[in-house]
Every structure is written in structure tokens, then in C-alpha cells.
């Protein structure tokens, strides 16, 4: 089997691409980074360093090559040849690749290819593949829409693996370092044709429970560790979470967001408490050097209505659950400053010019005046 994977960055190589290759697939990475693509084409393999309490080893990933995703003709040709398409490009890039996907699907169908094809976006967002499908359909010729609905599966997924950036290795410049833990859960109800047998890909018919469990716990906790750690003067996630006051705050935030999950999906409280502890331990992994600015980047996206801070807060409001720590976490996110991050600069500018209340309303889209006032007060008393 052959897979086309968009995004040859650390997540693509260290997580999704590795699982596909480990399952015997030939993996073609598509990316705009010429140097990475040239290395993939010439070396046809790379190393993945897996680190944790009980493991510190390098595994080779083979049967890989690359294509420049700006080469639309090559991408369209590959869409007709492959059995699976995956992405790990970041939520903002899905809009950009959608027009190429539309052209490629039109060409595949126009050429008489009636084999089903599944597309899985492996992004840090809720129902990222459904979003990609919407974007693709805005570019799709109406004459092809019925056939695309019939033959192309747009499969939502939840992904979880911490893959921090590392300095390139001189001998193996494609080497990527990852934590031992990984989780890739896909919505089995959305596949067309046979579901591919991929080691490490779990199937579920209740994906939203796992999407929100990850978003409300790993993503919420990671962001809060970053924002509060930065606020306290730390540079790395590991040193932030080793500060007992940071750890206690992050845990209390995850407990509040966890109460929403328990109420909404019936998760076992003890099992979820253990899941929180496992995540706190992952943040403290001594082998992962993860910068708070990498984790905290794009604060406006992370403060948006359906993302890791506001969505769990909305759940606490819906169910009448405690949320003092989530309120404080959002206030801490508002304090994030980074001269190299356009969103952080925009956030600081809005706070200075429009004030905290209008900034909260604009970027979070919250309507509840009392909740907005509580966030504003928490921000002003940081």
C-alpha cells in the first residue's frame, strides 16, 4: 500500500509517517521545505529517537520518499496512485492545501478511478478532517461532488504525541525525537471501503469523546503549563511543571475541564484522574526539551471559541460546574507576550488599545457578561 502524507515536519516524520511506514506502507511526504524533501528523496529513510522512563532508542523508518507540495502536477498524479492520504500541516494550512486536494480528486475521478480513497487530517483541532472536507468542497466542481461523497472518505481523528523541535543531527539531519506515548484514534464510521490495517491507529464510533478528552486535558494542560510557566519566568515546559505551584494550578485546571468530560461522556472519574497524572508526568519528561514559546504560540487560536481554554470553560457553564481555575488560566493566556509571534503581538496591541473586556469578547466570542467580567478581573489582578 502507498500513502501520501502532507507535512514532513516533526509530527509528520515522528508520529503519523512512522506509524504508516511501520505498517508496511510506502510513504511519500509532501512538503514545501525543499531541503527536507531532497533529503527524503536521497536517503529514503530517517531515524526516530524514542525517549521515556524505560526507553531511549533510535528506530529507522524506511520506504519513504518526498515530493514538493508546490508541484501541483505531481500531487495530482500521486492522488490517483495512493491508497491513503494523511496530513499533519497545522490547522491554518488545511485551507491552503484544499484547492490542490479538490483538483486532485477531480482528476482521480475523471480518470475513471473508482477505488475508495480515505483522507485523514491529523491536526490539533476538533474534527479537522471535516473542516478540510468543507474547504475542499468550496473548490470542487459541482459535477464531481456526488462521486467524491461516494468514493472519498474524510475520516476525523484525534492525535496525541509530544514531538518537540530539536537541533538537526549532523549525521542524520532528518532525525526526530518523540516521547514514548502516542495515541491516534480515528472515526471508523467515516471510512469508505476497507479500513486500512495500521499499527497504532485505534478505531472508535465515539470519536468526540476522545477528541475532547485530549483537547480538554493534554492541550489545555500543555497551554496552561506554558502560559503560567512563562508568566513565572521559565523557558521550558519541564522546568515549569517541576515548580509545585505551576503543577498544582495546571492539575486543578485539568480537574475542572475533566469534570465536564465526566459529565458529558460518562468517563470513569478514577480513570480520568489517572489520565491527568499520566499527562503531568509526560510534561516532566527529562528527555524532552520543549520551549514554552513553542507550546504557547498562536495565543489567539488557543483562546478561540472551540479551542482548549474556552471550550472547556463553556462546558463548565453548561453544566453549572466550578471554573475559577479555568478563568484564571484564560487570564494567564491573555498575559502571554512574545515579540516573535504575530498573534501575541496582535493580542498585546488589542489589550493596549481596546482594553481587556473588548479583547476577551473579540477573540473568545464569549457572550456571558459575568464570565467576561471575571476573566477581566483575573487578568487585572495577575
Swiss-Prot record:
One of its GO terms (biological process) is mannitol catabolic process. GO terms for molecular function: mannitol-1-phosphate 5-dehydrogenase activity. The keyword Oxidoreductase applies. It holds the Pfam family Mannitol_dh. Keywords: NAD, Oxidoreductase. SUPFAM superfamilies: 6-phosphogluconate dehydrogenase C-terminal domain-like, NAD(P)-binding Rossmann-fold domains. InterPro entries: 6-PGluconate_DH-like_C_sf (IPR008927), 6PGD_dom2 (IPR013328), Mannitol_1_phos_5_DH (IPR023028), Mannitol_DH (IPR000669), Mannitol_DH_C (IPR013118), Mannitol_DH_CS (IPR023027), Mannitol_DH_N (IPR013131), NAD(P)-bd_dom_sf (IPR036291). NAD(+) binds at residues 3-14. GO terms for cellular component: cytosol. It catalyses: D-mannitol 1-phosphate + NAD(+) = beta-D-fructose 6-phosphate + NADH + H(+). It is an enzyme of class 1 (oxidoreductase). Belongs to the mannitol dehydrogenase family. This is Mannitol-1-phosphate 5-dehydrogenase.
Amino acid at each position: 500500500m502507498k500513502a501520501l502524507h502532507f507535512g514532513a515536519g516533526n509530527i509528520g516524520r515522528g508520529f503519523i509517517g512512522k506509524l504508516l511506514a511501520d505498517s508496511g506502507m510506502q510513504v511519500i511526504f509532501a512538503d514545501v521545505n525543499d531541503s527536507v524533501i531532497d533529503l527524503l528523496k536521497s536517503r529514503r529513510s530517517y531515524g526516530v529517537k524514542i525517549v521515556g522512563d524505560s526507553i531511549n532508542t533510535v528506530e529507522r523508518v524506511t520506504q519513504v520518499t518526498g515530493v514538493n507540495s508546490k508541484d501541483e502536477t505531481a500531487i495530482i498524479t500521486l492522488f490517483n496512485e495512493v491508497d491513503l492520504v494523511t496530513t499533519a500541516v497545522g490547522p491554518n494550512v488545511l485551507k491552503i492545501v484544499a484547492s490542490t486536494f479538490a483538483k486532485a480528486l477531480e482528476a482521480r475521478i475523471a480518470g475513471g478511478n473508482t477505488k475508495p480513497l480515505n483522507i485523514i487530517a491529523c491536526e490539533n483541532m476538533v474534527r479537522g478532517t471535516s473542516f478540510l472536507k468543507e474547504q475542499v468542497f468550496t473548490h470542487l466542481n459541482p459535477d464531481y461532488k456526488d462521486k467524491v461523497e461516494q468514493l472519498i472518505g474524510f475520516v476525523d481523528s484525534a492525535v496525541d504525541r509530544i514531538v518537540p523541535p530539536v537541533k538537526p543531527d549532523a549525521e542524520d539531519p532528518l532525525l526526530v525525537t518523540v516521547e514514548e506515548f502516542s495515541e491516534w484514534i480515528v472515526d471508523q464510521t467515516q471510512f469508505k471501503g476497507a479500513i486500512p490495517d495500521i499499527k497504532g491507529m485505534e478505531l472508535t464510533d465515539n470519536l468526540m469523546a476522545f477528541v475532547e478528552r485530549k483537547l480538554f486535558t493534554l492541550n489545555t494542560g500543555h497551554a496552561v503549563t506554558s502560559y503560567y510557566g512563562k508568566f513565572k519566568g521559565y523557558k521550558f515546559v519541564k522546568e515549569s511543571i517541576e515548580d509545585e505551584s505551576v503543577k498544582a494550578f495546571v492539575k486543578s485546571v485539568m480537574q475542572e475541564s475533566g469534570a465536564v468530560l465526566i459529565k458529558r461522556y460518562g468517563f470513569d472519574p478514577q480513570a480520568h484522574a489517572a489520565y491527568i497524572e499520566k499527562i503531568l508526568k509526560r510534561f516532566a519528561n527529562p528527555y524532552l526539551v520543549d520551549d514554552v514559546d513553542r507550546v504557547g504560540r498562536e495565543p489567539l487560536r488557543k483562546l478561540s471559541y472551540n479551542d482548549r481554554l474556552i471550550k472547556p470553560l463553556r462546558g463548565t457553564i453548561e453544566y453549572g460546574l466550578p471554573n475559577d481555575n479555568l478563568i484564571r488560566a484564560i487570564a494567564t493566556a491573555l498575559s502571554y507576550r512574545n515579540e516573535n509571534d504575530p498573534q501575541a503581538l496582535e493580542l498585546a496591541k488589542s489589550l493596549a488599545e481596546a482594553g481587556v473586556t473588548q479583547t476577551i469578547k473579540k477573540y473568545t466570542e464569549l457572550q456571558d457578561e459575568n464570565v467576561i467580567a471575571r476573566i477581566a478581573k483575573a487578568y487585572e489582578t495577575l
